[in-house]
Amino acid sequence: ETLDTLKVNSNNEWGKLRSIVVGTALNANFPQYDNLYTTSMSAGGWKKTPPPSGAVPEQIIEETEEDLNVLIHTLDKFAVSVYRPNTLNFNEIVSTPDWKTDSQYAYCPRDTHLVIGDMVIETPMTTRARQHEAILLDTIRRQAIRDGAKWISAPRPRLLDSENLVE
């Protein structure tokens, strides 16, 4: 798939928006518990309220997609090019040599990528369930590079249980 010309260039947060990647809730999943979540939760938050796991209810996905489509329609009125990430079955297990988990979603691409000038930096995630999310922008990545963008990946932590410094 080839997209329209995709020029990457962001030097501030208030210039005219010309293009954007809008996430998707399709196939969203509440991933299995990972003690690394404690790094982004208030102390004891998971102990007080056990996290859900498994597929996000279809009603939530449908309502979220409806809201995202309204956003996309609004952006289209302002001639903003909208790109969307690929999606996967996020219930399937992904792994590294150190761990296995299911995935989460393709809802928040801004969490996984930082744009500075004409460079996109893939940023590491703090949870295993989101560690491989950058591949969902692979079609966009290939097009941006063809159109002159620089694209690098920051080092990714191994996300070992022993690396969890928050108790």
Report each predicted region and the residues it spans.
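The feature marks the mature, well-folded catalytic cores of soluble enzymes
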Residues: E1-E167
